[in-house]
Amino acid sequence: MRRNSERPVRITEVCLRDGSHVMKHQFTEEQVRSVTRTLDEAGMHYIEVSHGDGLGGSTLQYGKSLVNEMKLIEAAVDECKQAKVAVLLIPGIGTIHELKQAANIGAKLVRVATHVTEADVSAQHIQFARELGMEVCGFLMMAHSASVEKLVEQAKLMESYGAEAVYVTDSAGALLPHEVRERIRALRQSLNIEIGFHGHNNLSVAVANTITAIEEGATRIDGSVRCLGAGAGNAQTEVLLAVLDRMGYKLDIDLYKMMDVAEEGVAPLLPVPQEIQKGSLVMGYAGVYSSFLLHAERAAQRFNVDARDILIELGKRKVVGGQEDMILDVAAELAKIKMEV
């Protein structure tokens, strides 16, 4: 529980959803069961399971899942004795049909995610989730790309629709600690609901940003074991827990067990070590959606251009989640320019 706070700090473990990007959406049912079981035994509060781009994301554009996400959600629910299973839903990708399916299977929390300036498209989904009896949070993605005033305006919309919390979502891993501080502080002063923070580690400040968010009043935070998440991953859960414990925050999650999950359960699944490589670093620097990395690397190979140039150009164009088709367009344009030089 947070020191001197009326509300506990709760963590959502996102390695089985955000980490799906790294796994190219190829999680097996047994992998989900094994990781969920050990996370639950460690005392994790929420475990998010779905396609990397949320419910309904298994498409040619976003990447086809190996196993139907509903089977993975059902497997996670089956393994949880105390943790709650969460799902992500992006309106326009997922629908209330998939949301109802997930709720019937046993998912208890949904985070309804929109671009930071498009909260108005979340109304139906937030309201429907409340009708289903689910916990529901708003998830304002690419939070670095809007002013603090715009962020507050959009968060208030989500609050008015019935969201029980609103997250500052640093999808690009572009925010610095002082920018997190001013955003969380502004929301804390403007809303009557909980505030959350979801970070990415592309600039190596995800843990620092999360600590800053908590200091400013955020009570819902995200982490990914062994940094298994898009780009350079999220705040590394086991590291975050160790830091919070040193600071006097008691979350009732077993730190040793979380270390074991990371080393024995998740590390063997990683296609490559999760570290800040040039692609993820450029995403944080340019402010590009973290799940674009693998798409950009594939496009770079196909068109014989530098993935960094693709990402920088995408940042200049201020592309948002859902515009993955722009990656190929940019790569083709760069290849044409290269041939003309």
From Swiss-Prot:
Keywords: Aromatic hydrocarbons catabolism, Lyase, Manganese, Metal-binding. InterPro entries: 2-IPM_HCS-like, 4OH_2_O-val_aldolase, Aldolase_TIM, DmpG_comm, DRE_TIM_HOA, PYR_CT. Pfam families: DmpG_comm, HMGL-like. GO terms for molecular function: 2-isopropylmalate synthase activity; 4-hydroxy-2-oxovalerate aldolase activity; manganese ion binding. The record marks 17 as: Transition state stabilizer. The active site is at residue 21. It catalyses: (S)-4-hydroxy-2-oxopentanoate = acetaldehyde + pyruvate. Residues 9-259 form the Pyruvate carboxyltransferase domain. Substrate binds at residues 17-18, 171, 198, 289. GO terms for biological process: catabolic process; L-leucine biosynthetic process. Its EC number is 4.1.3.39. Gene3D superfamilies: 1.10.8.60, Aldolase class I. Mn(2+) binds at residues 18, 198, 200. Belongs to the 4-hydroxy-2-oxovalerate aldolase family. This is 4-hydroxy-2-oxovalerate aldolase. It comes from Bacillus cereus (strain ATCC 10987 / NRS 248). The lineage of its organism: Bacteria, Bacillati, Bacillota, Bacilli, Bacillales.
